[in-house]
Regions:
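C-terminal lobe/tail of nucleotide-utilizing enzymes
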Residues: 1-12, 118-127
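Short, well-ordered alpha-helices that flank and scaffold nucleotide-derived cofactor binding pockets
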Residues: 31, 35, 39, 60-61, ...
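Conserved catalytic-core segment of NTP-binding enzymes
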Residues: 74-127
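Walker A (P-loop) phosphate-binding motif
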Residues: 5-42
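Short beta-strand-centered segment that lines the nucleotide-binding/catalytic pocket of NTP-utilizing
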Residues: 40-55
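P-loop NTPase switch/communication element
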Residues: 52-64
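Switch II (G3) loop of P-loop NTPases
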Residues: 48-50, 65-81
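A structural signal for isolated positions on well-ordered beta-strands in alpha/beta enzyme cores
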Residues: 45, 70, 122-123
């Protein structure tokens, strides 16, 4: 993970948690990533964009003063999803094992890579 912080620019690294399918662990991963980075001494902003509001993280300040901004998105795709992807440095796509999540995952990948062709993303199987 440390390579994410060696950008050579004075801008925050934006980590986007995204998947069209709800209930796959986006919010839990977002909370844990933010807390883990804070415990390591990084200044972290947290964007709770999910209207369900399930995140436990209390810092909602997103700006370039942070080393990292962690953005938790809702479990649906919208025009805003593309905007989030345009401004992201990496996207994390949590998925659950099984076939039900494949189509939403593929649609998510299509939306974020069309919005930001250079976006790196990781698919994390969560159960």
């Amino acid at each position: 993970m440390t390579m994410l912080f060696q950008k050579g620019e004075d801008m925050a690294t934006n980590i986007l948690l995204v998947n069209q399918k709800g209930g796959v662990g986006k919010t839990t991963f977002a909370d844990e990533i933010a807390w883990g980075l804070e415990r390591r001494g990084h200044k972290v902003g947290f964007g709770n964009l999910d209207p369900q509001g399930g995140a436990n993280h209390e810092k909602d300040l997103l700006d370039d003063e942070n080393a990292v901004n962690v953005i938790d998105t809702p479990g649906f795709l919208s025009d805003e999803t593309a905007t989030y992807a345009k401004n992201a440095d990496i996207a994390i796509i949590p998925v659950q094992p099984g076939t039900l999540g494949l189509k939403p995952m593929k649609r998510t990948i299509k939306v974020i890579t069309e919005a930001n062709p250079d976006l790196s993303f990781a698919i994390i199987v969560n159960n």
